[in-house]
């Protein structure tokens, strides 16, 4: 798949290939917790599983177990392994949890920080996301596989509210099947729901998360989150790869009109330290409207001049026919640019900087109805305790060209937030 490479040395966890019983237990238990949290907001008490007919010995094992011979146990394990389908060995299960606290100096009366994507709750501890990923990876010609990302948490409504306008705290973030046709180096097809190819930043998961805790303005207001459809990707060489897709549009499980959107990506690696992604998506996105095309051109560049320094650049330009709120009947345009720098001071401690500006010339993307410009600067130190646990702090300052940011019972042109974030990856 054509995604940008990791910008810094992150918590790196390969797909877990635990035994079938462990994987089934983990998946079932996690799904049960997610469903229980959604349905009732409480976790059910654990149930006793030992039968009265097989009481436990002092060692914690049942008498039936202690009577078994080692040879019997080994034979039973061998028979069980032989009975399982071969694809079970390829099944991988991974998990990702992000939780945080954030405080907004503007102290908005509604408790919501303005123009934030996922970190919008002021003065609150939040479970941003808990994610379980189950997959069989397709990696070579003739391989077939699938991936399902189950996600729950406070950040999920920001994604699901754009899908038929229904917000929920549970989402199939991704769910797609894959096949690599034996053509050349391998022509890959993915069918289902998948995250967008646009943008420098990503929706977090076990196999990738951003250097900053909060998301950029470009991530939230210039580009889509997800797509549902089909895409084909092909690596022409080690330096050039491409992808094309036909999808329902922006963040839609079910299309809202009769037209489809088309996307494309050209990935270039001219030299080892530099990667450039040229992205585009276009098509009608308004409900019951097959004529007002929306086009977004997206540039991502990543340069790693040393083993400890990563530089990034993201630029976006968008246009939609006849939707301006400033000049009704005219086309709406928006544009933005973001710069990134991440420096690893040690193998465990790093510091990330981000600066960006976003101009919504026709008031459509930010929803102000005016020609608004919003800029921000963010500092994020991070400490990796283990390969599975990361702690981050963050200070962010937002500045607008007009009072559009909530402050107590009024509006202001700036806001400052501080946050602490813990990530667990398995």
Predicted features, each with a name:
Residues 117-154:
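Glycine- and aromatic-enriched membrane insertion/assembly motifs of diderm outer-membrane
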Residues 104-125, 155-271, 275-284:
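Surface-exposed coil loops of outer-membrane beta-barrel proteins
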